[in-house]
């Protein structure tokens, strides 16, 4: 199956299914000499892993990553980095009743038509379980970007109808929702408790921000940085929309409001989300992701079986009532991977480019 590799100079290839023996990633193109440890990777994996609160799937996976190659005495060698996470808490029997049915709004129907065979256990390859390897690979990218003064951070900005204003980065890591507003957490918990009683699911919005990105990243025309970020972020399970900067709000803006004016002291706004003409401007890069409600719920839904007969489908098993709750580390990982790839591509072509114009920040 193609489409398992992302990137051009810094590439990430993943393999594995939700209920298979393990998940695997091959990370290629990382420069040699980068200090890296299991703890660097495990930190973000622990932020993403299931079973950490009552508001996520109760599947218990330690998600302990193993580094198989490409690292020697705590430093990258420049060779391919092999990563592995073993699956330890599969309950495949939960899915035996739906092996010949198609769950509404799930990938069952489309995988069946594309390949003629599918792993029905937990969604197989289409499961968000695969994103554990992206997070592990993304931790390598984040470590490299940090050596260049670049940080990538994210937070939940909306859960269902509840909008979450940004207050502090410190709050993000202090609750299960990655909420930047601690005062919103009780409301989010109450909403999720009621959602569970209703046997339903809900969507979410995640915001991810990269700071310290130098001007010049992005390869027009078809590899514009915003196009590449949209590609990377849209590849995450359940993501149905991506905005860069003001995004769809720019439809209602006038040019006098939307344009990010420049002064010697810096840009006056950042409606462009840190990208102009497909190239980073030096401002913070800001992206927003819309994640749909998970389709795996216990409320019956109409569908068909493999023979086309009408059926009612009830999905058993352990599922996230809101996949957005664990999506923040995944979004950070994909943005970091995309930025590292473009940073290396920029170096390859433009390392000797020098201009006298100062780099502007945001006032």
Swiss-Prot record:
EC numbers, comma separated: 4.2.3.5
Pathway the protein acts in: Metabolic intermediate biosynthesis; chorismate biosynthesis; chorismate from D-erythrose 4-phosphate and phosphoenolpyruvate: step 7/7
Pfam families, sorted: Chorismate_synt
Catalytic activity field: 5-O-(1-carboxyvinyl)-3-phosphoshikimate = chorismate + phosphate
Keyword Amino-acid biosynthesis annotated: yes
Keywords from the UniProt entry: Amino-acid biosynthesis, Aromatic amino acid biosynthesis, FAD, Flavoprotein, FMN, Lyase, NADP
Names of the cofactor(s): FMNH2
GO molecular function, one term: FMN binding
HAMAP family noted in UniProt: Chorismate_synth
Family from the record: Belongs to the chorismate synthase family.
Subunit-level organization: Homotetramer.
Protein known as: Chorismate synthase
Species for this entry: Pseudomonas putida (strain ATCC 47054 / DSM 6125 / CFBP 8728 / NCIMB 11950 / KT2440)
Lineage of the species this protein comes from: Bacteria, Pseudomonadati, Pseudomonadota, Gammaproteobacteria, Pseudomonadales
